[in-house]
């Protein structure tokens, strides 16, 4: 009831919920051969592990849909081994380091997880995943195997790192490296898939996948900031000591010591972590501008707009220190609908960067740095899509630069998607208007 009342108090979000579930048409509806039992089961496993990821994966272009699904399940299997504290290190570490070799087999399974491990079924039925994996194009198999090797060894290294296990993340450099292994490598693998399928520009692979890495780091850092309290309850934390030690001697004190001074210190720490995460935004916008397939674009864009909205929510927010802070469900629906084109994504980023800037307090130690960073990002958004009304009257066209070339190269793609969006809006508005007129007519009939 509370969520329904919340929606009623935000009518734009209420309309977004109705439009998303009633009128939005996926670009590529997920159609599968019901007789292909292994493939059907793999998608069932995908839904069991993550319904949100399953929803966006199932709408991908058929060329990449199965490859991305298998990529996700393989990494989920790897993560399930790494997370399970009931598996002895003598078994876990060799298994992580050699997990990529299991992809050479066709019937390998693993039943060594604890009975309460949430995603143990993925490993128990790994032979079904292998069956579909071996049907993928060899190039797609190689990409999945390569990332599995890198991630498995990265996980094993962290398990053996006593300093990390005892004291957590030490420096900002360590923070970046940890996020790279957890999320940046996923971006690298997906980028290789996009480029190989001709869905993304080849320049996405330049500079050792720097832009793809930023995409992953931006998401992971946002989650790490948001999950402070939850991670603390699990006896761990990923906030880098190099940052939090400026504000407290013990990281737990932000939650335990309930004084105005400690709360201010905790919020200041959150804000510096947000500042650090914002350093990846321009790379993320660059990356998205170079993804040309509409379904792949949405697949990449949705998590990014959720992340920037979440950053705006956690910024300068003491609630992060004592519980979970999330964006509203209605906001989520609105962001999904509005992030299907590059202009839509740029508009969303600009909106939430302005929210962050307006929430800033002059008392914050990083007030000026945050203001400068937000200004830089807003300016970057303006460079991609300038406000033509603000241009001098004498300037009839924009001078050519990298942004005008990128926008021009994808204009037909975004316009095609925009037409679909406008049709959805029209259909939704007509139905809502009709329902509203019917309700008013009934009220009039009853009263008069």
Swiss-Prot record:
Compartments, as annotated in UniProt: Endoplasmic reticulum membrane; Microsome
Gene Ontology annotations of biological process type: ergosterol biosynthetic process; farnesyl diphosphate metabolic process; isoprenoid biosynthetic process via mevalonate
Protein keywords: Endoplasmic reticulum, Lipid biosynthesis, Lipid metabolism, Magnesium, Membrane, Microsome, NADP, Steroid biosynthesis, Steroid metabolism, Sterol biosynthesis, Sterol metabolism, Transferase, Transmembrane, Transmembrane helix
Induction or repression: Expression is induced by lovastatin and fluconazole and is repressed by amphotericin B and caspofungin. Expression is repressed during spider biofilm formation.
Cofactor: Mg(2+)
Pathway where this protein functions: Terpene metabolism; lanosterol biosynthesis; lanosterol from farnesyl diphosphate: step 1/3
Record's bilayer topology term: Single-pass membrane protein
Top-level enzyme category: transferase
EC numbers, comma separated: 2.5.1.21
CDD domains found in the cross-reference section: Trans_IPPS_HH
TM regions (residue ranges): 428-448
Pfam families tied to this protein: SQS_PSY (PF00494)
Source superkingdom: Eukaryota
Catalytic activity of the protein: 2 (2E,6E)-farnesyl diphosphate + NADPH + H(+) = squalene + 2 diphosphate + NADP(+); 2 (2E,6E)-farnesyl diphosphate + NADH + H(+) = squalene + 2 diphosphate + NAD(+)
GO molecular function: squalene synthase [NAD(P)H] activity
Gene Ontology cellular component terms for the protein in this record: endoplasmic reticulum; endoplasmic reticulum membrane; plasma membrane
NCBIfam families reported in the protein's UniProt record: squal_synth
Family statement drawn from the similarity comment of this UniProt entry: Belongs to the phytoene/squalene synthase family.
Function: Squalene synthase; part of the third module of ergosterol biosynthesis pathway that includes the late steps of the pathway. ERG9 produces squalene from 2 farnesyl pyrophosphate moieties. The third module or late pathway involves the ergosterol synthesis itself through consecutive reactions that mainly occur in the endoplasmic reticulum (ER) membrane. Firstly, the squalene synthase ERG9 catalyzes the condensation of 2 farnesyl pyrophosphate moieties to form squalene, which is the precursor of all steroids.
UniProt name for this protein: Squalene synthase ERG9
Upper taxonomic lineage: Eukaryota, Fungi, Dikarya, Ascomycota, Saccharomycotina
Gene giving rise to this polypeptide: ERG9
